[in-house]
Structure formats: structure tokens, C-alpha cells
């Protein structure tokens, strides 16, 4: 079996590339996916988002090694093992990232990936419902909507931010990210709008696109040229050959693992596992980054939260309405208000993100408070801690060693202390007076730096945004894995295009920029002239040098 292009992974970037590479009918595409079909309400019903990320049917089941700076806790790292990849098990929050994120990419060696370069691709991929005119796309495959915000707590959160002196923004994906405002969702007609729904399924209707179920074991190389992929399906091993190129889009965990199993990575590490060296790229598996967050929870004195919807009878009613009509509480992820703010004067653009939720519960649906409550997920966006993904053995079936080194930089502790105290300030505003009860978490007794630090060690969680392990950069950067056209340095016919190529993590959730990578990489693969650069200037707070708000 062979095709012009072979893509490993049907996730956010992989699905976008399958769609774009096959679009004009000139080239054939094979997408290799080990995961299951994305069928059923547990995947497609937005309110069921906590289920697929906890199910081995849909998730690769990765966890970090015990993290020494948070009391040896091992944090789960859900990655989608399903059509659509992690876009089929994520929280459906859509964030492009800040313009300065991409300018930093370009300045650090990923030339051609500045905001002016990537904005046209964001516009091309979006079908924005209600976004800022002129800044958003309206004809793309990816539907993006805002929630209805029927619950008054969503408005209280935005008003509280305004009362605290922060900006308000109607579209954080438009000209102005900074501020409090509505959150955007990849939901369409009451269903999760994953990369599979947006890109892969339309592509699979074309005669030149084929989906192959199989476990990718390694890249097949002839000398220093990639010519195919060895896969395992059942107990059968076979090679799918690529006439033009192999593109890895297997996630920030599996993409570096696959490179190393194929002889591309740190020479000493490959030798340790008896793997023949093809290209010594010491950056493979390094530069691992993530977003961490804590939940600041408050009791609600009015019975208006989702707490009353957590019993089995209510869940059944919500499920039936969604199955019949795709409406009601099942048709939203319930993340409908958000904020991006700056932590202090001298910070040019936001470095803190908020998700607001009208219930007190963990992101994975566990440990719900036994009362009406609301919460903010809050965390710094630009941690200085860096981790790694390395091989446990040369057996492709073994999970890799994942070390995030969470909270290993002292600045991370100061940033999180500020996040906790700032959230308390926001919840203390007059807008919450009609609703505010006692603080559930951390609890009023947690006040000093040491007490907050202990709370963080026990309760900090991953936001599930791993990236950076196949860093994009200049060819002469020894830690770069791919060049600015996503080509693996030192190997021909092989590219990586997913969140693993991010030089630095972006502001917010990663599904949006990962899809953008797939869109832009497709143009490089096809040898097309990039879309015309944008001349739109994003809003930067004129007071950034003297104030945090």
C-alpha cells in the first residue's frame, strides 16, 4: 500500500493536513490512525467531556513520572486515541493564542511564523459565529461559537473583572486578547466540532484519501530518506510507503517517541537502547512544556449552579434531550466566560488565563463539591519549567518516560501565589455579592506564602496542553528538530507538524494553534506560496509598563 503522502495521526493537525493535501485531487493521502471511531454521545455530546479523557478506549493513558516538586505526584496526560485525536477528548475551548506568542516563535528561529504570517491561516480555518468582524474567518471548516451564557454567574465573573479594574474584551481571538469576556467553543449544532468532524470526514469522502487503522512502529528509511511507515495491525506487520513524504502528527508525546524509535534523536540516548543512529538531533523529546492550573472554588448562596444537574435523574434528562434535539445543558461544555490578564506592570501581554465554571468540580468530572458552587481554573501561561519525553525501551509498545519537571523554576511559585490571590480579589468584587458563600478551595485558612505553596503542591493539575518536544527553529540551532517548513533536520522526505513543533507554548488552549500548524504546514509540503501576510495590528494595553490592568 502506498500514497503520495502518509500522515501518522488523525488529530488536530493531521486531520487538517489530510484535508488540505488532498483538496485539489492531485495527490493521494493515507492517514494512519490507531484509535477508534469517534462515535457515540460520550464523544459528541459537549457536556460529556470528562468521560472520554478518562477512558482507555479513547485515551493513550499517559502519565508523568513522579514529579519531585509537587510531592511526587504523577499527573495524567490525556492524549486522544480516537479519530480526531485530542480534539475529540478535549474541553472544546478555542483559543488562537496571543499575537506576541507567534512573534516570539519567529524571533527564536521559526522564521515565517510571526503573527502576521499565521493570522491568514487562522482566518482560513475558522467559521466564526459572532467573532470580531475583519479579524475572524467565516467560511472555514472549523465552526467556533460562543455559549449562551444563560447563567448569571457568567456575567458576574466578567463584571467582577471589570470592577477590579481589568479590561473587558468581546473577542479574545480578535484584536484584543486581554480582558474578561465570553469564551469560545468548538461546538456546532450542539455537537463537538472536532478536527475529525471539521476536516477528516469531509476529506475521507474524496477518492484520493484513505484511512488505515494501525499502530505506527517506526519510520522506514533508506539511508537518510524516509520512504514509509512500519505499522502493526492485529498481529501483522506491514509497510505503508510514501512516494513523496511522511508527515508525523502523532502528538507531543508520540511524535518524539516515533522519531527516536526510528533513529532520530539524541545519539547517546539511542545508543543506550540499541537503536542505530540516523540523525543526531539532541532536541528530540526535550523542551516539553505544559500549562498547569488550580481550581479556586466558592460556595454559591443561590441554587443556580450546575450542582443540581449532577444527580443521575438530571443527567439522564439532559442526555435524552441532547440525543433527541442536540439542545439543552448537554449541548455546551459550560465554559462560557473567560479571561486573559497580565500579572504585573512590565508584562506586555497576558500571562494568566481563566476558565470560569458555574459548578465546583474537577476538570475530569471527579470530586464535585457537595453544595452549590462556582470556580475559576487559573494558571500562568508561560512557565519557565521544562521537561522531556524519552524512551523507556526500544519496544514501540512501551509508553515513553514523561518528565515535565512541573514547578521546577522558582518563578512558577511566585506566579501561582499571585494567581490564587488575584482570583480571591475578583471573587470578592460586588458583582459576586448576591452569590458568594464560603471559600471551598483553598479555604480561608490558606493565606501565607507557605500555606499557598502547600495547596499548590497538593492540588495543582495539568490543563492537558503538552507541547514543544520537536521544536521548530533555525537549521543551525542544535536543539531544533524541524526547520521553519516543518522538515526534520538531517532527514529527507520527513516532516513533523503538530503541537510538538511549538518553540514555546502559546497563551491558552492548544487545539486552535495545532490546527493552524496543520493548515500552514500543508502549504509548505505542497510548495505553495504562503498566504499573504496580514497588516492588522493587535491591541496591546497602553498602560502595560506601569500597571497590570
UniProtKB/Swiss-Prot annotation:
It is an enzyme of class 1 (oxidoreductase). FAD binds at residues 4-33. It catalyses: choline + A = betaine aldehyde + AH2; betaine aldehyde + NAD(+) + H2O = glycine betaine + NADH + 2 H(+). Gene3D superfamilies: FAD/NAD(P)-binding domain, Glucose Oxidase, domain 3. PROSITE patterns: GMC_OXRED_1, GMC_OXRED_2. Keywords: FAD, Flavoprotein, NAD, Oxidoreductase. Its EC number is 1.1.99.1, 1.2.1.8. Disulfide bonds: none annotated. NCBIfam families: betA (TIGR01810), PRK02106.1 (NF002550). This is Oxygen-dependent choline dehydrogenase.
Amino acid at each position: 500500500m502506498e500514497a503520495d503522502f502518509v500522515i501518522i495521526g488523525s488529530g488536530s493537525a493531521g486531520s487538517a493536513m489530510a484535508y488540505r493535501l488532498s483538496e485539489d485531487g492531485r495527490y493521494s493521502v493515507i492517514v494512519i490512525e490507531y484509535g477508534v471511531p469517534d462515535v457515540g454521545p460520550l464523544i459528541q455530546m459537549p457536556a460529556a467531556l470528562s468521560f472520554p479523557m478518562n477512558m482507555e478506549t479513547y485515551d493513550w493513558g499517559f502519565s508523568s513520572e513522579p514529579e519531585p516538586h509537587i510531592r511526587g505526584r504523577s499527573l495524567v496526560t490525556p492524549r486522544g486515541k480516537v479519530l480526531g485525536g485530542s480534539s475529540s477528548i478535549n474541553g472544546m475551548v478555542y483559543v488562537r493564542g496571543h499575537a506576541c506568542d507567534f512573534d516570539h516563535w519567529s524571533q527564536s528561529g521559526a522564521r515565517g511564523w510571526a503573527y502576521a504570517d499565521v493570522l491568514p491561516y487562522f482566518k482560513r480555518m475558522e467559521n466564526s459565529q459572532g467573532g470580531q468582524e475583519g479579524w475572524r474567518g467565516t467560511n472555514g471548516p472549523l465552526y467556533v461559537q460562543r455559549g449562551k451564557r444563560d447563567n448569571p454567574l457568567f456575567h458576574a465573573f466578567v463584571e467582577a473583572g471589570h470592577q477590579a479594574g481589568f479590561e473587558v474584551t468581546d473577542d479574545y481571538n480578535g484584536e484584543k486578547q486581554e480582558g474578561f469576556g465570553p469564551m469560545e467553543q468548538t461546538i456546532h449544532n450542539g455537537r463537538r466540532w472536532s478536527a475529525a468532524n471539521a476536516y477528516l470526514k469531509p476529506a475521507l469522502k474524496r477518492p484520493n484519501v484513505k484511512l488505515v487503522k494501525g499502530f505506527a512502529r517506526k519510520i522506514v528509511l533508506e539511508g537518510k530518506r524516509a520512504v514509509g511507515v512500519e505499522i502493526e495491525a492485529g498481529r501483522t506487520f506491514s509497510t505503508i510507503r510514501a512516494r513523496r513524504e511522511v508527515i508525523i502528527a502523532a502528538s507531543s508525546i508520540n511524535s518524539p517517541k516515533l522519531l527516536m524509535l526510528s533513529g532520530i534523536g539524541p545519539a547517546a540516548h539511542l545508543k543506550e537502547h540499541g537503536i542505530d543512529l540516523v540523525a543526531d538531533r539532541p532536541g528530540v523529546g526535550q523542551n516539553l512544556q505544559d500549562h498547569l492550573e488550580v481550581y479556586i472554588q466558592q460556595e454559591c448562596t443561590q441554587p443556580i449552579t450546575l450542582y443540581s444537574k449532577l444527580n443521575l435523574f438530571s443527567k439522564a434528562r439532559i442526555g435524552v434531550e441532547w440525543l433527541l434535539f442536540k439542545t439543552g445543558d448537554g449541548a455546551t461544555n459550560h465554559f462560557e466566560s473567560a479571561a486573559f490578564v497580565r500579572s504585573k506592570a512590565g508584562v506586555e501581554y497576558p500571562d494568566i488565563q481563566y476558565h470560569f465554571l458555574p459548578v465546583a468540580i474537577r476538570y475530569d468530572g471527579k470530586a464535585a463539591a457537595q453544595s452549590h458552587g462556582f470556580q475559576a481554573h487559573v494558571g500562568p501561561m508561560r512557565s519557565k519549567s521544562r521537561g522531556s519525553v524519552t524512551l523507556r525501551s526500544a519496544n514501540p509498545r512501551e509508553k515513553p518516560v514523561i518528565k515535565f519537571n512541573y514547578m521546577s523554576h522558582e518563578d512558577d511559585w511566585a506566579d501561582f501565589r499571585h494567581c490564587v490571590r488575584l482570583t480571591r480579589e475578583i471573587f470578592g468584587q460586588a458583582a459576586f455579592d448576591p452569590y458568594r458563600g464560603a471559600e471551598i478551595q483553598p479555604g480561608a485558612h490558606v493565606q501565607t506564602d507557605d500555606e499557598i505553596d502547600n495547596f499548590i503542591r497538593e492540588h495543582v493539575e495539568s490543563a492537558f496542553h503538552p507541547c514543544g518536544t520537536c521544536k521548530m527553529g533555525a537549521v543551525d540551532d542544535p536543539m531544533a528538530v524541524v526547520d521553519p517548513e516543518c522538515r526534520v533536520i538531517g532527514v529527507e522526505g520527513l516532516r513533523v507538524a503538530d503541537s510538538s513543533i511549538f518553540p514555546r507554548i502559546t497563551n491558552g488552549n492548544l487545539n486552535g494553534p495545532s490546527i493552524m500548524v496543520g493548515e500552514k504546514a500543508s502549504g509548505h509540503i505542497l510548495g505553495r506560496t504562503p498566504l499573504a501576510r496580514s497588516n492588522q495590528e493587535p491591541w496591546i494595553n497602553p498602560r502595560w509598563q506601569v500597571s497590570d490592568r
